[in-house]
Amino acid sequence: YPDQSLWYDLCDKNGIYMIDETNLESHGSWQKLGAIEPSWNVPGSLPEWKDCVVDRARSMLERDKNHAAVLIWSCGNESYAGEDILAMTQFFHAKDPSRLVHYEGVVHNRAFAAITDMESRMYAKPWEIREYLESKPEKPFILCEYMHDMGNSLGGMESYVKLAEEYPQYQGGFIWDYMDQAIWHTDVMGRKVLGYGGDFGERTTDYNFSGNGIVYADGAEKPAMQDVRYWYASPADRAAQDAVNAVAAAQADRTLAEAWQSRRAYPLVVTQGDGNLGVKGKNFEMLFSIAGAGPASLKVNGTEWLWRAPRPAFWRASTDNDRGCGFPLRAAAWMAADVFVTYNGMKVLEAGPDCVKVQFQFGIPTVPGASAELVYTVEAQGALRVDAVYHGVAGAPELPCFGVKFETFGPVTRTVWTGLSGETYPDRYKGGVF
């Protein structure tokens, strides 16, 4: 939709190209309950709408024609196709032949392919785009909407950016969209929060469907932004960040010699009982419970830190895009596994004065079943390493997450995270800095 003129001025000054789009959107007339049914659609080829939509094109062009930032005109959004929108294109071409015209809706009716100067689609899969680009097309390709950044999402951006580097005719895409639409209000607890649909007592609402930006409504960056920043940088800048991360990871993975006096290691005292294994060192002690499926106690300087035995974690809160593709139902077995994981026994792998290593084995009630292990390594210097191991099995549903639930006795205020910055996931981690 046309924006306020100040935004166009800023784009002119900062070298930001834009597609200027008329305020035309009518997908409610031809898209019924998600299905395409264009037997009656607006504006279509209805003569009573033709002058109206051409007037919208004229108003936008006359207002914005002198903005250097405007690279392309767009006839509108999600309004199917027909003679009326074709008339808009003809007006743009006649009045301003220096600029191209964009429109996505012709993908639903190729009889009106002449409306647009480029192939434009929404949310096309990378292999669909590749298929188009390999077919020796006459028109360049643009994704007028992609990534669908609802809530905490925007995974898999790499697949699209790499297309732009491989195919000259792939012109990139527009993330849907930039900023959440939300309003400050006071919630039932008296807190000032950003509210969306349903937070204001209304019953007919789209709920959080307005929360689709890469920044929040107050302009603060959402977790996805660090990956957007990474993939929208030049290939050279991305390579530089990858090199920095590789060096940092290599340094973190090796033992660094301390410049001053090394910490003295006191021999570990190991006590083996029928139901427990005790490990005691300088200022710390641990108790591993055979029956309790993990550590029963972790004390440092006499203070207990462990609330309950750690457990493997297989579930996380579902996101908007998860729910949109039915993922919570497909992966529901992992929610059950997260709660009902079975304990299969403890094995002492090593028990000496310098190191104690204990393995706890778990069965995962998926179909087919799987297994996991938590391995605790206690070193004489007082370090505790926890390794979580999941043994994958063919045929199991997609795994939402894998980690360790580690509940402490009270809040922990002094922690150091060694890993990637921000919120990362297998398909959204390249922007993280080590």
Tell where the protein language model's regions lie, with residue ranges.
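Extended substrate-binding grooves/exosites of carbohydrate-active enzymes
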Residues: 1-253, 257
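Beta-strand/loop-rich accessory regions of lumenal/periplasmic or secreted enzymes
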Residues: 244-434
